Amino acid sequence: MARISLASSSAGVAGKPRGGGGLHPLGQTRKTLPGERRDTTQKITKPRYKPGQKALKEIRRYQRGTELLIAKLPFARVVREVALNYLGSEYGNLQWQSMALLALQEAAEAFLVHLFEDVNLCAIHAKRVTIMQKDMQLARRIRGAWGGAG
């Protein structure tokens, strides 16, 4: 059985469009001209970041800022709950000054930041970039009973 090859001027298959169909090479639609309406069926894709770029951007943002990262109301609820459990029900109607709660939150966040710095150093010492539970345990064990305070 012999095969017959038909040579034609178009190299595409009949019925299938050639090319990108009017799309930008990166998958974006072309810009609309003034007075021209955009076709709502075509989707404009956002530019994709390389893996790890968004994480690095987030790290830089948090290192630059000084704002509190834990929400204030949930933190205040936890503080009140711990105080109630520690002191007992006879002190059930304790009132807290907002500055006292703010000072506790500042101290708690500073403690956590310092702890995670130590945990990161433990992970780097183990030739890893990912922190693990064993890094947290080692950092807390090295810090001692008071967690590096005092």
From Swiss-Prot:
InterPro entries: Histone-fold, Histone_H2A/H2B/H3, Histone_H3/CENP-A. CDD domains: HFD_H3 (cd22911). One of its GO terms (biological process) is 2-micrometer plasmid partitioning. Gene3D superfamilies: Histone, subunit A. One of its GO terms (molecular function) is centromeric DNA binding. Belongs to the histone H3 family. PANTHER family: HISTONE H3-LIKE CENTROMERIC PROTEIN A (PTHR45810:SF1), HISTONE H3.2 (PTHR45810). This is Histone H3-like centromeric protein CSE4. It comes from Yarrowia lipolytica (strain CLIB 122 / E 150).
